[in-house]
Structures are given as C-alpha cells and as structure tokens.
Amino acid sequence: MAVKTYKPTSPGRRFVTVSSFEEITKTEPEKSLIVPLKKHAGRNNQGRLTVRHRGGGHKRMYRIIDFKRNKDGIPAKVVAIEYDPNRTARIALLAYADGEKRYIIAPHGLKVGDVLMSGPDADIKVGNALPLANIPVGTLVHNIELYPGKGGQLVRAAGTAAQLLGKEGRYAILRLPSGEMRKVLLECRATIGQVGNLEHENITIGKAGRARWLGIRPTVRGVVMNPVDHPHGGGEGRSPIGRHPVTPWGKPTLGVKTRKKNKASSKLIIKRRK
C-alpha cells in the first residue's frame, strides 16, 4: 500500500496523508459477521468517565474477528481483503471448505486466492496459525495467545510482528514489538508473518476535524486549566507547573512506572520494554 498526499489547497489539506487503500478488494462487509457497535464516549456501566478524550466519531459496525484460529485441518480460501474501522490492520475474509466464513487480521503479503490452514500440522506459511511449539525459531509471528485457547491478544496492530527467539522447557521466548522479551506457553497459538498495512505509521491525521471523525476529542493541558480542574492549573499568566508533574487526580506522572509491583506475570518477562 502507498500513502497519498495532497497539494496544500487549504490549511487543513496541507499536512494530511491518507492510505491509498489499493489492497482493499471489497467495500461492503460480510453481513453475517457484523454486529452494531454502541458508542460509550469513554463512560463505564455507571455512566462515569473512565477514559478521557473519547466521543463522537463516525458510526461503525463491529466486524467479528476470529482471533482463536481453532478451525483445524480445514482449508480456507482468502475471498477478500477489507477495511476495518475498528483497528489499524486490514482484515481478510476466509471461506472454509465446509462453507463457513470468518474474518482474520490480514498479514503482510496475503492475497485473494491464497489457501490458509490452522492446527499443529499446518505449513510454515504466511497466514497459517499453529502452536508456538510447532513454529521454527527465528520466525516472525503475530496474533499471539497468552493463554491456550483464549485467542490472540498480542501483536495485532498494523505493521507489527514478534520474533520467536527460542524454546525453554514449557515456554517459548518471544521478542515483542515494544522490545520486551517474554515467555509464552508453547501450547499458545500464533499466526505466521507480520501484520499488514505497513504504511500506517506514516499516516498524518493533519487536522483536528479528522481526529473528531475517528472519535478522538481534544486533550487539554492541565497547566492551562484553573486550580479547581487540575493540580497544574492557576497562576498569573503563563506559569510553569511549579511542582513534580501529576495527573488530574494528583498521582505522579511523566516517567513514573505504572506497572503493578507484584504482578504474577512479571516472572515471565525476561527483559522489560524499552
């Protein structure tokens, strides 16, 4: 895929870059695999704001994605590559030999007409899913399970890939896109290859309005608020923060570690992220 730029015909157009969408082969989603997606604007089940800067945006339908890849031994043909508004990656529509259709995250290099397989006996080929125990060391993988049978949770964003560095006892050792090295059970499944839509990192939103189309609301700095709204607020004119930076709720921020000290999974992390 390529990134499209525009002539600066207006201030809003000047820095905008968009995907060319040239890999997309089908514009309407598969009707049996979509469900309505309700907007929550960052509110939880009590109606309280738990995630800031969310709200508005274009209406979306949720595409049901097969993260488990548990349909073993049945070949699936790639019917289409589609756009998904709910993620940065593209999605691929698979038609299985028994008639079932499923969406998966589209890996880089996957084309319409390719035939994919899942299961321990699948070939080492882009788009095939198999347990880490059956994948050769050095292979790039994505959509990795943390718990066997739960479905892929790691490495699902556009252009990402993890590398299988080795196997030790019951665990595989992976290098994740963040730089973290961690152990994952060998029974956990992963999909071969790198996630597609590699150029996503080069896209510039370019104007505030386009962020609003995506459901992203403005981020107001605490230092420009009043003291009632933020610990950094107040002062005459343009004032410095005047203390160690804190969140709106008074917790230390900017460079402070937020990971729980005694988290059970810490023993599986060999090297923390950069």
From Swiss-Prot:
Function: One of the primary rRNA binding proteins. Required for association of the 30S and 50S subunits to form the 70S ribosome, for tRNA binding and peptide bond formation. It has been suggested to have peptidyltransferase activity; this is somewhat controversial. Makes several contacts with the 16S rRNA in the 70S ribosome.
Gene Ontology MF term list: rRNA binding; structural constituent of ribosome; transferase activity
Source species of the chain: Carboxydothermus hydrogenoformans (strain ATCC BAA-161 / DSM 6008 / Z-2901)
Keyword Protein biosynthesis: no
Entry protein name: Large ribosomal subunit protein uL2
Bias kind Basic residues: ranges: 257-274
Segments of this protein annotated with the region Disordered: 225-274
Quaternary state and interactors: Part of the 50S ribosomal subunit. Forms a bridge to the 30S subunit in the 70S ribosome.
GO biological process, one term: cytoplasmic translation
Gene3D superfamilies assigned to the protein according to its UniProt record, in alphabetical order: 2.30.30.30, Nucleic acid-binding proteins (2.40.50.140), Ribosomal protein L2, domain 3 (4.10.950.10)
Listed GO CC annotations: large ribosomal subunit
Family recorded in the similarity comment: Belongs to the universal ribosomal protein uL2 family.
Gene assigned in the entry: rplB
Pfam (any one): Ribosomal_L2_C
Coiled coil: none
Keywords: Ribonucleoprotein, Ribosomal protein, RNA-binding, rRNA-binding
